[in-house]
A protein has these predicted regions:
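Amphipathic alpha-helical binding modules
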Residues: 75-115
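Short intrinsically disordered terminal tails
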Residues: 1-8, 23, 104-115
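Intrinsically disordered, low-complexity, compositionally biased regions/tails
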Residues: 17, 27, 39, 51, ...
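Alpha-helical oligomerization interfaces
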Residues: 31, 35, 39-41, 61, ...
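Short terminal alpha-helical segments
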Residues: 2-43
Length: 115
């Protein structure tokens, strides 16, 4: 019997926050990881920058960098840039969600949100 589960990109857990399944395809794990790293950097700013402004700027910068790298390689794929940007945003917001739930004591093992 073969395993028919679809593998998705997961944000690693920490302390009181279990891993979070982003729903993004596993091939986009790199984008999810970069988004989570950016979220950690935003948290270190301790409110100096509004979350919405930070997320919008970082997602745009990520997409711009990815598109530039594709142009250098001579193979721009607009769809791939778009889904990678969405995975990046899922990583960023997912990490913020993990911190929010942990701070509120809302540790969950719901299969749709955790892995």
């Amino acid at each position: 019997m073969t395993d028919q589960r679809i593998r998705t990109a997961v944000i690693n857990g920490f302390d009181n926050a279990p891993p979070l399944d982003t729903g993004a395809p596993i091939e986009l794990q790199f984008a999810v990881d970069l988004g989570a790293i950016c979220a950690d950097a935003w948290l270190d700013l301790k409110g100096d920058v509004r979350l919405h402004d930070y997320a919008a700027h970082q997602a745009a910068a990520f997409a711009h960098g990815m598109k530039a790298a594709m142009q250098d390689a001579g193979e721009v794929d607009v769809h791939r840039v778009t889904i990678s940007r969405q995975a990046f945003a899922a990583g960023l917001m997912g990490r913020v969600q993990q911190h929010l739930f942990a701070a509120l004591g809302m540790v969950t093992r719901e299969p749709r949100t955790t892995h």
